[in-house]
Design a protein with these regions (language model features):
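Short acidic/polar mixed-charge low-complexity motifs
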Residues: 1-2, 13, 111
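Short beta-strand scaffold segments in enzyme catalytic cores
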Residues: 2-5, 119-120
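Residues in well-ordered beta-strands of folded domains
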Residues: 4, 20, 145
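Intrinsic disorder/low-complexity segments
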Residues: 5-7, 37, 152-154
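Compact structured core domains
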Residues: 9-55
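Nucleic acid-binding interface residues in structured DNA/RNA-binding domains
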Residues: 50-158
């Protein structure tokens, strides 16, 4: 998986503001600064070990609703999933379109993997990823889910 990492200085402190998956054929560039390089190293470690803990300074920008969705996503254990509707119910949202709005908040997440939006799925399938429901990004989501599920299955063996 190829990624692009965006950083920004906030009051003199560098922060990660975005992580984006790139198409397989995309050319990659060297990280633009030390923080981006650190982020890429941690993402590469995650690829080898889904237990990797990220210790990156993040700038998380979003509405109060989005932040609540993202907090719930961060509480989903590795190897587990919740549906968009389950996340909505955890938030106390009962409107008929609540699952769709949760899906929008998942798609608006600019820090995938670090804020694990891939752990939120549709009631009848994998759902979307980064505002798309097909193509290489859905393959990335499937890979992330399988990567984490395999790690759990391996750990549960006697």
């Amino acid at each position: 998986m190829k990624v692009a990492v965006a950083t920004r200085d906030v009051n003199g402190n560098p922060c990660i503001v975005g992580i984006r998956y790139l198409p397989p054929a995309a050319e990659t560039k060297a990280p633009v600064n030390e923080l981006a390089e650190r982020a890429v190293r941690q993402l590469e470690r995650y690829r080898e070990d889904p237990d990797t803990k990220f210790d990156l300074p993040l700038l998380i920008e979003g509405t109060d609703f989005q932040r609540r969705v993202w907090e719930i996503m961060c509480a989903i254990p590795r190897g587990r999933t919740l549906t968009y509707g389950e996340v909505a119910r955890k938030m106390g949202e009962g409107a008929s379109d609540a699952a769709r709005v949760v899906g929008q908040a998942c798609g608006d997440n600019k820090l995938p993997i670090v804020i694990p939006c891939h752990r939120v799925v549709g009631a009848d399938g994998v759902g979307g990823f980064s505002h798309t429901t097909d193509g290489y990004l859905i393959e990335v989501k499937r890979w992330l889910l399988m990567h984490e599920a395999r790690a759990d299955a391996f750990e549960l063996r006697p």
